[in-house]
């Protein structure tokens, strides 16, 4: 249960660099565990020197206290025995930070009848036992909402359920036996809503091994839009624990209020009635083949094309031309929505992402430490408040920044703005009108995105060679 995925759980001696419990020394494995746990579930971004060498360990203490508070432990700020024991417990793989009973933005299914498919099976249990466990897990949520579920045997369902080991194609590899048991994604298109179970676990229907019904009930709560709860009585509490009454799970009031805030109560006399809070209108989800579609930013990332719009982005890969649709927060939780510009400086294997007067550096699915920074650190004058578009030209190792009717050129090698800039866009890119939304450099051409149109520009001939719809990259 993680939030680009949702996962079910889950050095040399460290002297004064890390808070210790009494005179106990933490061994390498304990420190590795603590570091990985805080990074994975509490968004801790360590600095090697600070983490292992500085005596001022307040950032570490705060993260330990944050973990202790969420999981209901005594807030000592130290790696005491109770804290280390909790870190060893199997749990959901979704991070605990966020403070939402539902996911940010409250994603939900826009219908009450939801399909699911069990794609493959664990060898630990008979197929019919797996079928029954999943059906009962969904029934837990069905009993307190208007939702109904139906299973299909082929094709794509709203919720695709599968068993896998290690790296399985979603940036959230499983870790073998223990700790992260499973993960699921919040509602949405593509792999959103799907639930993955670590097949390295020993799945069971009783107290031995890992109880599939209990884990599935938790994970499918994520598939319906619920986040983690810090209530130990809640089914959505992230740490796994077997209940002897597992055949008759009773949702906590926290669980009921969370799911009913998304879908309402079950329309029957025996349903638990909970007032449904008013919900602010959510931003519309962009439609890829909308003829009026425009993009906020466009870039490449390690050979893939990324097209950003509001809270979402499309991802088109070389091996799968059908674009995937994702929430920005699912890959980069700390990035804002409604981006202004993005470009890949692939000589540095990173993407710079801009919004307002700030920018972030991203490598893979990690936002780099030390960001955001102010755009003026790149050499812009104080009069520049935001960037409209940016693009990197690999052959020249130059980045072009477009602002209004002008553009700047940045030397990536020297990390300085080139002299003689800004210049008018129309002087050097004839046929391209000011106020560019996004720019992409690919196949020897510049592609300028302006509203719902894009212009293919040949830099050698200094002319526009084609005019296309912006979303033609999305097979529209």
UniProtKB/Swiss-Prot annotation:
Example GO CC term: the record gives:
extracellular matrix
Q: Which cysteines are joined by disulfide bonds?
A: 289-476
Q: According to its UniProt record, which residues of this chain constitute the active site?
A: 219
Q: Name one GO molecular function term.
A: zinc ion binding
Q: Which cofactor does it need?
A: Zn(2+); Ca(2+)
Q: Which residues are Zn(2+)-binding?
A: 92
Query: Pfam families this protein is in?
Result: Hemopexin (PF00045), Peptidase_M10 (PF00413), PG_binding_1 (PF01471)
Residue numbers covered by motif Cysteine switch: 90-97
Task: Extract the signal peptide range.
Answer: 1-17
Intervals holding Hemopexin repeats: 286-335, 336-382, 384-432, 433-476
Propeptide positions: the record gives 18-99
PROSITE patterns per record = CYSTEINE_SWITCH, HEMOPEXIN, HEMOPEXIN_2, ZINC_PROTEASE
Q: What reactions does this protein catalyze? A: Similar to stromelysin 1, but action on collagen types III, IV and V is weak
Listed binding positions for Zn(2+) 2 are 218, 222, 228
Q: Which InterPro entries match?
A: Hemopexin-like_dom, Hemopexin-like_dom_sf, Hemopexin-like_repeat, Hemopexin_CS, M10A_MMP, MetalloPept_cat_dom_sf, Pept_M10_metallopeptidase, Pept_M10A
EC numbers for this chain: 3.4.24.22
**Subcellular location, record wording:** Secreted, Extracellular space, Extracellular matrix
- What is written in the cofactor note of this entry? Binds 2 Zn(2+) ions per subunit.
Family, similarity comment? Belongs to the peptidase M10A family.
State its role: Can degrade fibronectin, gelatins of type I, III, IV, and V; weakly collagens III, IV, and V. Activates procollagenase.
The free-text domain note is:
The conserved cysteine present in the cysteine-switch motif binds the catalytic zinc ion, thus inhibiting the enzyme. The dissociation of the cysteine from the zinc ion upon the activation-peptide release activates the enzyme.
Q: What is this protein called?
A: Stromelysin-2
Originating species: Rattus norvegicus
């Amino acid at each position: 249960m993680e939030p680009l995925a949702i996962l079910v759980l889950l050095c040399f001696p460290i002297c004064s660099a890390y808070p210790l419990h009494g005179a106990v020394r933490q061994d390498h494995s304990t420190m590795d565990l603590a570091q990985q746990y805080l990074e994975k579930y509490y968004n801790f971004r360590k600095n090697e020197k600070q983490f292992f060498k500085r005596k001022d360990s307040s950032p570490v203490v705060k993260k330990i206290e944050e973990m202790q508070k969420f999981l209901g432990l005594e807030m000592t700020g130290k790696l005491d025995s109770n804290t280390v024991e909790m870190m060893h417990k199997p749990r959901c793989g979704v991070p605990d930070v966020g403070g939402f009973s539902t996911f940010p933005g409250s994603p939900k299914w826009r219908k009450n009848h939801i399909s699911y498919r069990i794609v493959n099976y664990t060898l630990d249990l008979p197929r019919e036992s797996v079928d029954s466990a999943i059906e009962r897990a969904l029934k837990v949520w069905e009993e307190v909402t208007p939702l109904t579920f139906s299973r299909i045997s082929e094709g794509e369902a709203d919720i695709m359920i599968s068993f896998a080991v290690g790296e399985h194609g979603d940036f959230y590899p499983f870790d073998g036996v223990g700790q992260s048991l499973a993960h699921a994604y919040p509602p949405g298109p593509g792999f959103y809503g799907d639930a993955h179970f670590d097949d390295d676990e020993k799945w069971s229907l009783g107290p031995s091994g890992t109880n599939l019904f209990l884990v599935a009930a938790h994970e499918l709560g994520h598939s319906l839009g619920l986040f983690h709860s810090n209530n130990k009585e809640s089914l959505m509490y992230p740490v796994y624990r077997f209940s002897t009454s597992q055949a008759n799970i009773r949702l906590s009031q926290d669980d009921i209020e969370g799911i009913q805030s998304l879908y309402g109560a079950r329309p029957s006399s025996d349903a638990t009635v909970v007032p449904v809070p008013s919900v602010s209108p959510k931003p519309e989800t962009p439609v890829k083949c909308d003829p009026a579609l425009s993009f906020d930013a466009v870039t490449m990332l390690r050979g893939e094309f990324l097209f950003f719009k509001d809270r979402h982005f499309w991802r088109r890969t070389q091996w799968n031309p059908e674009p995937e649709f994702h929430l920005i927060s699912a890959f980069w939780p700390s990035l804002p929505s409604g981006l202004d510009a993005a470009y890949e400086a692939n000589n540095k294997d990173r993407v710079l992402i801009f919004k307002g007067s700030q920018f972030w550096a991203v490598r893979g699915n990690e936002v780099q430490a030390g960001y955001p920074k102010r755009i003026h650190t790149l050499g812009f004058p104080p009069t520049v408040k935001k960037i409209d578009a940016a693009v990197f030209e690999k052959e020249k190792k130059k980045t072009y920044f477009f602002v209004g009717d002008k553009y700047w050129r940045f030397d990536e090698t020297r990390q300085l703005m080139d002299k003689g800039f800004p210049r008018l866009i129309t002087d050097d890119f004839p046929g391209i009108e000011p106020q560019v939304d996004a720019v992409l450099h690919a196949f020897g051409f510049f592609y300028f995105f302006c509203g719902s149109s894009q212009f293919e520009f040949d830099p050698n001939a200094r002319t526009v060679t084609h005019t296309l719809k912006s979303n033609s990259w999305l097979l529209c």
